[in-house]
Amino acid sequence: LLRLYEPTDGTIIYDGKVLFDKKEKIAVDMLPYRRRMQIVFQDPYASLDPRMTIGDIVGEGIDIHHLCANAKERHDKIISLLERVGLNSEHANRYPHEFSGGQRQRVGIARALAVDPEFIVCDEPVSALDVSIQAQVVNMFEDLQQEMGLTYLFIAHDLSVVKHISNRIGVMYLGKMVELADSFELIAHSVHPYTRSLISAIPVADPVT
């Protein structure tokens, strides 16, 4: 969708603009869209450069898009982003190996927010985290969405997480969209067998036996 890898088929339309169309051989330059569209990766360990400080990781997008006029403005923005995701100013000078998985994912989120995007692809952003940390990160995603007016494409296989954060849910099976509905409607009245199998895997606090 973000064309980090070139699609092999189909059409991508964003905000009414065709970004990619295989049949029509359309593939627009994505640079103008990089600020508007960002991604949070699944693996908080592999997605951060171990040779860079946290401050430089978060600041990389700021530098590429020339978003700050001077070093002080850049520094202040980086610290503000770290604090927004639950980290602090001291973390800016540290390296990824000094952090837990949950903290690294917060760094990844701060990096995505650094260019003030409007749309973020969240690619299984909590699947590699402990359950207790998952809840914290999902709640943070919700808070950031409210504060910044963000739109998420939240990719996950755990419907208990998806239903908590999503307004609409689309279910993919064998590479095709088999069901799309409002979150409550899909959970309450699913049609496709694969959707039902995902729902049946959601833990129930007080199951009736």
Located regions from the model:
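A short, proline-enriched helix->beta-strand linker immediately N-terminal to the Walker B motif
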Residues: 114-118
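Conserved ABC transporter NBD signature motif
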Residues: 10-21, 33
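Short catalytic/signature loops enriched in Gly
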Residues: 182-209
